[in-house]
Amino acid sequence: MNNTAKLALGAVAVVVAALLGITFLVPGGPSIGGPGPSNEASLAPEPTPTALRASVGEGRLEPGTYVSHPLASNPLLAVTFTVPDGWYAFDDSTLVPLGEGFEGPDGAVLAFLEISDVYSDPCESLGDPDVDAGATAEDLADAFSAQPAYEASVTDLTLDGYSGKQVEFQLPSEFDASCPRDEYFVFGGGPYPQGPDNRWHLTILDVDGSRLVIFTHDFAGTPASRQADLESMIASIEIEIEIED
């Protein structure tokens, strides 16, 4: 393993990885064995049929409108967004571009996350996160900006009528090889950096008592078309609290 940290995508991603012949890293698990999914037909499942508000699910996505339910604490919170051509879903809340994958120097990711706590030292992340991040968008943004291990700039924003914070991270260009497992966790459960100079963009929203984190990452080498895809998906987002049956 080199000292470049890898992305934790959860147990569902491991299942998808088995289908693709790729090994993904989850906390405490083995390292990634290769890049993200490619456009090779032999490596990707059949495209998911386009449907209005189809669940994101897993596999290669046809362009269209999809819905994700990313919060375990509030499963009725629904995020609807439009996916352009050339994207693959690892699970209900994590998308990567076909071809580039998620690693540097040209990868990208869109994910919907639930973050409760952060690490004061991302290099010492074997235990639970040690900094409480409160319950609001401002609380989490303040927790990030207070940590000296990385640079995080915070601005106010509104998305689909919900107010929150935009946090831009510039992560270290190199990670200390003495980090346990060569990993660098900013918050519990991943994701974590995919290569030197990985750029993170977090949109943190207060949504009717819940906190939703919309996470994207890219690199200087990420194609402009993929960066435009990320921007268009975020711009298309509509958030609602569904009525329980």
Each predicted region: which residue ranges?
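Structured domain cores in non-transmembrane regions
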Residues: 119, 123-140, 147-149
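Surface-exposed beta-strand edges and their flanking turn/coil or helix-capping segments
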Residues: 125-127, 165, 179-184, 226-231
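Cys/His-rich zinc-coordinating "finger/knuckle" motifs
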Residues: 94, 130, 186
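Signature of long, low-cysteine stretches enriched in small and polar/charged residues
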Residues: 137-203
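A broad, low-specificity signal for short, low-complexity segments enriched in glycine/proline
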Residues: 47-49, 124-131, 172-177
